[in-house]
A protein has these predicted regions:
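Conserved acidic segment of CheY-like receiver
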Residues: 15-36, 68
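Conserved active-site segment of CheY-like receiver
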Residues: 22-23, 99-104, 124
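C-terminal output helix
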Residues: 125-138, 145-146
C-alpha cells in the first residue's frame, strides 16, 4: 500500500532539503540515483540510524530538512523509535516524514501512522518500480504551495 498525505505537498518551495535515514548503502545509492533520474536535485543528507538522525536534526549547524525519508529497520534506534522522539520535540514534529521501508507488517504501518507520518511507501525490489515510488514523493512535493509552520 502506497500512502502519502497532503502535508508532503507543503514543503517544496521554501524547504528543499531532504534527510534520508537509511542504513543500507544499496538503498541509499538507489534513492540518490532515482532522485537524480527524476530531476530532483535538492541537497540530500544521509545518516544510518535514528540516533544519528536525531543528532543531525538537533545540530543547529545542519540545515533543517523539508522532508525526511525514513527506513524502519535500522540498528541502534529504529524508525518507529525515531518517530516517537521527533514527534515529542516541538522544533521537529512538523517536519513531514515519509517511511520508505521493506516492511509489509500491518503493525509497522499502524505504528508509523500513529506517530503522524505523512506517508508510508514500500520499497520495491526492482529499480523501475522504485523510481515510480520516488516519483510519487516528488510529484506530491513539487505541487506544494507553502512550507509548514
Amino acid at each position: 500500500m502506497q500512502t502519502i498525505s497532503n502535508e508532503v505537498q507543503l514543503i517544496m518551495r521554501t524547504q528543499q532539503h531532504i534527510l534520508l535515514i537509511e542504513d543500507d548503502e544499496v538503498d541509499v545509492m538507489t534513492v540518490r540515483r532515482s532522485l537524480k533520474d527524476l530531476g530532483v536535485d535538492y541537497p540530500l543528507d544521509q545518516v544510518s540510524d535514528g540516533e544519528a538522525g536525531l543528532a543531525f536534526l538537533r545540530d543547529a549547524a545542519n540545515p533543517r530538512p523539508g522532508l525526511i525519508l525514513l527506513d524502519l529497520n535500522m540498528p541502534r534506534m529504529n524508525g518507529v523509535e525515531f518517530l516517537a522522539e521527533i514527534k515529542q520535540d516541538p522544533k521537529l514534529k512538523r517536519i513531514p516524514v515519509v517511511v520508505l521501508t521493506t516492511s509489509q507488517e500491518e503493525s509497522d504501518r499502524m505504528a508509523s501512522f500513529d506517530r503522524n507520518v505523512s506517508g508510508y511507501m514500500l520499497k520495491p525490489v526492482d529499480y523501475p518500480q522504485f523510481v515510480r515510488t520516488m516519483q510519487v514523493i516528488r510529484d506530491y512535493w513539487s505541487t506544494s504551495e507553502e512550507a509548514p509552520n
